[in-house]
Amino acid sequence: MHTVTPIPAFNDNYIWLIHAKDSGGHYVVDPGDAKAVLDYLEQHQIVLDGILITHHHSDHTGGIAELQASHDHKLTVYGPDNENIKGINHPISGQTESVKPEKLDSDAAVFHLPGHTLGHIAYLIDDHLFCGDTLFSAGCGRLFEGTPAQMHHSLQTLAQLDETTLVYPAHEYTQANLAFALTVENDNEALIAHAAKVKQLRDQNLPSLPSSIGLEKQINPFLRPEQASIKQNLSCHFAQDVTDDGTSFTLLRQWKDNFL
């Protein structure tokens, strides 16, 4: 059994702290800001055991060196082996399907999710999915390196997980994503209801996360590019006939990239 706590960092990052109830271990996911982590550890008298990295962007990796230095270089650091990330001492290859982090209570299933970056991975520990910048609540990551087809496939992989799976993205982007999703689907009742709930949370400066796979399948247009109503709205917006799922996903991402 594991519990998960958000450590806010920068303007909108979450560094997720995983606590293993039985083994007593603690890992952080994507610690871009060492100070935020160290302050939290000190405040709560927690000893850190390791780090899980999803991809190479500095707001996810920038704290590795300082965290290692503050722990006598004894931290276990997992991450993709093909993203040139300094500080990883347990590299994960493209063939790896799971890892067993010491002092966690369960193995971590590994998902290879090219799109946001080519080597992006996610970790599933029990029913907790740490998906970095691939899947956001009501959205998905920008395509800095991969293709729309790769991201579409990566998201469809995650959509196959159990609907009760909890989703822990690395950013508090939910309200902005919901604004776009409501533009695409202004009659989606689940989306309208969730937007109201998220507004209440954010008005109190509370996280909108975690989400769940089941919820995302209802509110996230990037998980449903095949839906006829989404294709129809895309056809109207882009003044072209949108029939296949791949084109639908590509145009959704293009629309979001330019959405204000």
Curated annotation (Swiss-Prot):
Binding site for Zn(2+) 2: 59-60, 133, 171
Catalytic reaction annotation: an S-(2-hydroxyacyl)glutathione + H2O = a 2-hydroxy carboxylate + glutathione + H(+)
Signal peptide: none
InterPro entries: Clx_II_MBL, Glyoxalase_II_hydrolase, HAGH_C, Hydroxyacylglutathione_Hdrlase, Metallo-B-lactamas, RibonucZ/Hydroxyglut_hydro
GO molecular function, one term: hydroxyacylglutathione hydrolase activity
This protein's pathway: Secondary metabolite metabolism; methylglyoxal degradation; (R)-lactate from methylglyoxal: step 2/2
Keyword annotations of the record: Hydrolase, Metal-binding, Zinc
Annotated GO biological process: methylglyoxal catabolic process to D-lactate via S-lactoyl-glutathione
Enzyme Commission identifier(s): 3.1.2.6
Cofactors named for this entry: Zn(2+)
Pfam family, one: HAGH_C
Note accompanying the cofactor annotation: Binds 2 Zn(2+) ions per subunit.
Domain of life: Bacteria
Catalytic EC class: hydrolase
Binding residues for Zn(2+) 1: 55, 57, 116, 133
Function: Thiolesterase that catalyzes the hydrolysis of S-D-lactoyl-glutathione to form glutathione and D-lactic acid.
Family: Belongs to the metallo-beta-lactamase superfamily. Glyoxalase II family.
Subunit composition and interactions: Monomer.
Protein name as it appears in the record: Hydroxyacylglutathione hydrolase
